[in-house]
Amino acid sequence: GDVYKRQHYTKVKTISFENFPNRSAGFVWGPMESMFNTALQDIYMQQTRLKQAKRGGDLQLSGEITNYDALNKGIGSDGYSSMVELRMTVRVNFVNNSNPAENMNGQQFSASREYNANQQLSAVQDELVTQMIKEIVEQIFNATVANW
């Protein structure tokens, strides 16, 4: 645990983020890009001792939001209301300059949420996108530094 942690922090002190653009082939929702980028940076700032570098960090994250769309799921478990599945996918490139074996190239992370088709997407979008972003950001964090 702690000894391993200390070794990591002696080699790895900084992290840099490139903006993840929203290149969704499906829907494009304006706020999504900044919501995602903020959430991604926040988790590293809050849960590690890494300092943010403008560029060339010991750890580097880049990528893009590749998809945001909805799928009609048909009848829900209640037997009559139909459900819509909202889906979001992010592609991530990760560079660990102190341990290149941990690098990731184009790794995909996804999340989905369902809502009732009787609801307007605009009424639930903010909350559901926030939840999906949180889930994806946690997946990315776990895939990059959680083993510390």
Each language-model region and where it sits:
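N-terminal segment of the mature soluble domain
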Residues: 10-66, 98-102, 139, 144
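Compositionally biased, intrinsically disordered linkers/stalks adjacent to structured regions
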Residues: 125-148
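Short, small-residue-biased leader/transition segments that mark boundaries at the very start
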Residues: 1-4
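Extracytoplasmic/periplasmic, Sec-exported soluble proteins
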Residues: 24, 28-36, 82-86, 121-133
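Surface-exposed short loop/turn segments
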Residues: 47-48, 58-104, 108-123
